[in-house]
Amino acid sequence: MKRNYQPSRVKRARTHGFRARMATAGGRKVLSRRRKKGRYKLTVSNEKLGKKY
C-alpha cells in the first residue's frame, strides 16, 4: 500500500520554497510572522534542498 508522504526535493521547494511564499500575499504574511518569531529557517529553501554536497 502506498503511503501519503512520497518525498521529492523539487516538489517541496516549489510548494514551500521562498519564491513560492513571496508570490502570494498570504505567503508574505507567513514569512513576516516567521521573521517576527525569530525562526532559524524561514522556508524549506534554507535547507539547501537541491544541492549535492
From Swiss-Prot:
It comes from the Bacteria. This is Large ribosomal subunit protein bL34. InterPro entries: Ribosomal_bL34, Ribosomal_bL34_CS. GO terms for molecular function: structural constituent of ribosome. Belongs to the bacterial ribosomal protein bL34 family. Keywords: Ribonucleoprotein, Ribosomal protein. Pfam families: Ribosomal_L34. Gene3D superfamilies: 1.10.287.3980. GO terms for biological process: translation. One of its GO terms (cellular component) is ribosome.
